[in-house]
Amino acid sequence: MIKIETIEVAGLAGALTALRLPYGKEVRSKMYTTIKHWQEGIDDPYHVWKNGAEVEINNRDLALMQTLVKRGDEHAKVVRGINVWAKIYAPIFLLREIETYRFGRERLASESTMHQQCRGLSGDELVKAKSELPMGTMQLTVDMFSYQTLRRIVIQRSNHRLPEWHTFIDWVRTLPLADELIFCGLNEDN
């Protein structure tokens, strides 16, 4: 069974800052950002990275973003800046279909079939084992998606025959501002 876990959502402050630039206007929303990095001591093995933004979205900014999203990708460039990182545990066949989305999606890493299912094999034995892996083999990946790409996936896959796509779209619905910036203007069927 497919499982998707949101790791992080970021970029709203940057997207809002860019929103009104084409017309030389200032952002109306209020943003408070924090970026700090420190290490407690020389022997401390951990670095602390604190990165965050508190955003109070002005209703007119949100309405403008929705208007641009509804007009299409060429107008909705601003939502490319809002990104989500997720752990996806899914069959290889779904992961291959997700790879259709080359822009606004990046696979940061995936479990290695060579280091896990085919551990200790080499040469012809390794090639044979990898070529015989079933497409239904479950694999864990970490992927990054822009909100613009997630909207495209929702539009293109909402009526797909594979039930895994419906689970994926259900996950998209859980994201912050998904109704406002991903699903806005779409039919209730999506």
Segments predicted by a language model, with ranges:
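Family-specific signature for flavin-dependent thymidylate synthase
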Residues: 1-190
